[in-house]
């Protein structure tokens, strides 16, 4: 009887995990080790960019760069919950380019998708999605334009 209960519990946990949202796997974030310190934004420049965001207790949660070392990003979050506001700040080496969107979003992930392009994955809750498991998903590619400004190559999803 005991093994049957254990099996039933494992099946229930597995079904719950399968039904709790989906996030496609992406490549590992790029490393800043391939680029020199002059290719990345300084701590002071990052702090100034964070200071320009809406008032919150922002803290860095991730950073990366494209293989050509020009486009850098810093992801900041305003909390520890899975649905806390987040923002992506872009930099052309040590020059701030601004955030990916005017307003913070939740459930953001950034990956490098080409030599000079970063892809931001946005997720959002739909219907009765629990906070842990958003099912809405969209991606936007960003790169530094010829004018030196950040530009999106795809429409930004509007949840």
Model-found features: residue ranges?
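Bacterial N-terminal signal peptides that target proteins for export
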Residues: 1-10
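Residue-level signal for mature regions of secreted extracellular proteins and peptides
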Residues: 13, 28, 125-126
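C-terminal motif of bacterial Sec signal peptides marking the signal peptidase cleavage site
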Residues: 16-19
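Bacterial signal peptide processing site
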Residues: 21-23
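Extracytoplasmic low-complexity, Pro/Thr/Ser/Ala/Gly-rich segments
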Residues: 26-83, 157-159
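Short, flexible beta-strand-to-coil junctions
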Residues: 75-86, 91-95, 123-126
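Extracytosolic low-complexity repeat regions of secreted or lipid-anchored proteins
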Residues: 92-153
């Amino acid at each position: 009887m005991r093994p049957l209960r254990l099996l039933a519990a494992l099946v229930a946990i597995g079904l719950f995990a399968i039904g709790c949202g989906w996030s496609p796997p992406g490549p590992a974030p790029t490393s800043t080790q391939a680029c020199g310190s002059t290719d990345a934004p300084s701590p002071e420049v990052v702090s100034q960019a964070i200071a320009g965001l809406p008032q919150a207790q922002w803290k860095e949660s991730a950073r990366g760069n494209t293989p050509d070392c020009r486009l850098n990003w810093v992801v900041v979050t305003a909390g520890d919950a899975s649905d806390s506001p987040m923002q992506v700040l872009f930099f052309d080496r040590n020059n701030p380019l601004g955030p990916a969107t005017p307003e913070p979003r939740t459930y953001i992930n950034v990956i490098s998708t080409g030599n000079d392009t970063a892809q931001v994955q946005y997720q959002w809750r739909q219907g009765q999605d629990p906070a842990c498991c958003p099912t809405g998903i969209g991606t936007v590619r960003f790169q530094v334009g010829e004018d030196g400004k950040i530009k999106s190559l795809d429409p930004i999803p509007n949840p």
